[in-house]
Amino acid sequence: MFLPQEFIRRKRDGQPLDRDGMAAFVRGVTDGSVTEGQVAAFAMAVYFNDLSTDERVALTLAQRDSGDVLDWRALDLDGPVIDKHSTGGVGDVVSLMLGPMVAACGGYVPMISGRGLGHTGGTLDKLSAIPGYDVMPATDAFRRTVREVGVAIIGQTARLAPADKRIYAIRDVTATVESVAMITASILSKKLAAGLDGLVMDVKVGSGAFMPTAEKSAELARSIVDVGNGAGMKTTAILTDMNQSLAPCAGNALEVACAIDYLTGKSRPARLHDVTMALSAELLVTGGLARDVGHAREKLQQALDSGAAAERFARMVVALGGPADLLDAPARHLARAVVIVPVPAPASGVVQRVDCRALGLAVVALGGGRTRAEDAIDVSVGLSALAEIGQRVEAGEPLGFVHARDEATAAHAADAIRRGYVLGDTGEAPPTLYQRVD
């Protein structure tokens, strides 16, 4: 007979946990026979005594198996089922370009995304800025879109890794969110439940990153790669910069417009392009669609230049209920804020540092994110034309623009931007890409 308290005692005392015990514990989490207090005790024991790689694999697989696991084999797809996941940041709109780009190169991308968390923007919130787009379609519609278009970006259903949802909710109120072992299992259980052949992980580093230090980001990347591969899914990771907004804008409708401009060739901001191409190329190599990164970049650039990637995005939008002319007339469909004001620089100088987290929180305060799960969001608000680290600005020139629903919230956001920028005599842009982990 399985006794949860004895299982917890083993981890409390630093003893190893086996796969059968982990599976039994997670089954109890799912069916309710393991209490909230026992989950909290287990999470704290893991926080202090950690999990080995084998234990992390066992926890990840048990959470994967707590609900539905998608199987794409019956569709007889002619390419790999692959995806990218980001730890989150500000202005991180990569998914909206990467999915269609990889699909145009022969991959199948069933991207199951989340809503905003804390100061970070969520891919689902961005897509909710597209009128009619169904972020929670029926499973048949999701599978059909992946098969016919090559990419579908949707939200997580309650039937995928339900144990993770309960464990995370308890971790969130018991000061155990920071456990790298449990973060790893949380991320990968959902990706494995999506039935992926391969995953590329984008782990952010910097003032707007989820992890507090570069060392912790590197530790998470290493853990995800080891556990993903240990669970039978080819996994690599890239550490990328989040010391400033990745796109020159942050906010849901603004970022969708940025993604459309990128796909159609109207504008491809350098830092955003670097990260998008690096992750997309890594994904093509992971899926066996390119022999090396150089070959992958050629294929991706061709997909952009030919319009094939933009076409995949347009088809995905239509397949999931959005407007057919979104790429031709985005301004017709994407909400525009009532108040748009510049944020003048208080002095002349070079941007030395940006408090990226503060920018993300400014978007939340404008109404573009949530402070509670049940909050509605305003997709029109956000920040645009943000000055970059290393850029010189003159006194009175804008550090960026605030898009708000009223003058009062605009003024608060403008103050946050001014406080978030540090100007000096010199400043150098940080690298966009730090390290590949395999």
UniProtKB/Swiss-Prot annotation:
PROSITE patterns: THYMID_PHOSPHORYLASE (PS00647). The keyword Cell membrane does not apply. SUPFAM superfamilies: Nucleoside phosphorylase/phosphoribosyltransferase catalytic domain (SSF52418), Nucleoside phosphorylase/phosphoribosyltransferase N-terminal domain (SSF47648), Pyrimidine nucleoside phosphorylase C-terminal domain (SSF54680). Gene3D superfamilies: Nucleoside phosphorylase/phosphoribosyltransferase catalytic domain, Pyrimidine nucleoside phosphorylase-like, C-terminal domain, Transferase, Pyrimidine Nucleoside Phosphorylase, Chain C. It comes from the Bacteria. One of its GO terms (cellular component) is cytosol. Pathway: Pyrimidine metabolism; dTMP biosynthesis via salvage pathway; dTMP from thymine: step 1/2. One of its GO terms (molecular function) is 1,4-alpha-oligoglucan phosphorylase activity. InterPro entries: Glycosyl_Trfase_fam3, Glycosyl_Trfase_fam3_N_dom, Glycosyl_Trfase_fam3_N_dom_sf, Nuc_phospho_transferase, PYNP-like_C_sf, PYNP_C, Pyrmidine_PPas_bac/euk, Pyrmidine_PPase_CS. Keywords: Glycosyltransferase, Transferase. Pfam families: Glycos_trans_3N, Glycos_transf_3, PYNP_C. It catalyses: thymidine + phosphate = 2-deoxy-alpha-D-ribose 1-phosphate + thymine. Its EC number is 2.4.2.4. One of its GO terms (biological process) is thymidine metabolic process. Transmembrane segments: none annotated. Belongs to the thymidine/pyrimidine-nucleoside phosphorylase family. HAMAP family: Thymid_phosp. The enzymes which catalyze the reversible phosphorolysis of pyrimidine nucleosides are involved in the degradation of these compounds and in their utilization as carbon and energy sources, or in the rescue of pyrimidine bases for nucleotide synthesis. Homodimer. This is Thymidine phosphorylase. It comes from Burkholderia cenocepacia (strain ATCC BAA-245 / DSM 16553 / LMG 16656 / NCTC 13227 / J2315 / CF5610).
